[in-house]
Amino acid sequence: VHHILSGVIAEGQTQKGMQNWGGGVGGYTVGMESTVAPKGIGSWIPSGGEFAYQMHYTPFGKEAVSAEQIGLYFYKDGEKPELIMREMPLVDQFITIPANDPAHKEIAYFNFPKDAILHTAVVHAHYRGTYSKLEILDPSGKRETILNVPFYDFNWQRMYEFAKPIDIKAGSKVIATYVYDNSKRNPANPDPNKEIVWGDQSFEEMFYTSLRYRWKDETVEKQPNYAQPLNKPPPTAMPADHPPH
């Protein structure tokens, strides 16, 4: 299994290949542990609808049976979380990694339209990914590194939970940086002589950061729709020599 994505959709709306859902209920990638929300916070699952799961398998030349299991943990009767955990991917599907480049850099970002609190981050690349960094650039110009993964390993992709959840001011940029080694010095590289672009299979590449956060002014009883301004425009790719400022 390469990865599993999940979501909640309206009944009968499931489509092959879809990955944009109204809410997430956890996921999996190689080396990742279970997803647990802090006390008083939960994933919002409206009544009706369906769970949707995107199952990504990498072919390895043999017939096999999928053996994944999914467990959902609910609050006890009479208990109700007041706050809602949201999920948002920062994705750049326009990456191009030159052949034989030992340290190719890609940068992308998006703007948070409202005040938020960031709880976790997952960085995801394939065999050529070697390094990843996540930064916050607030409206005053202050820039802070909140996650640094100096030795990315495809076989150990962790969900990084911040010891202290991070305040994100409205208008802040969340900036992701990835470095790829597409040279022969990378022992996991399937083909250093090939230019690499975005692709689902492990011998291709990805630039994918998953963030779990909550809106500061959102509660179960008060749910403003911030998804639309967050998704439009989509995350913006930037040339590595012209980072956002």
What are these model-derived regions, one by one?
Residues 1-117, 123-245:
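Beta-strand-centric surfaces of beta-sandwich/beta-rich domains
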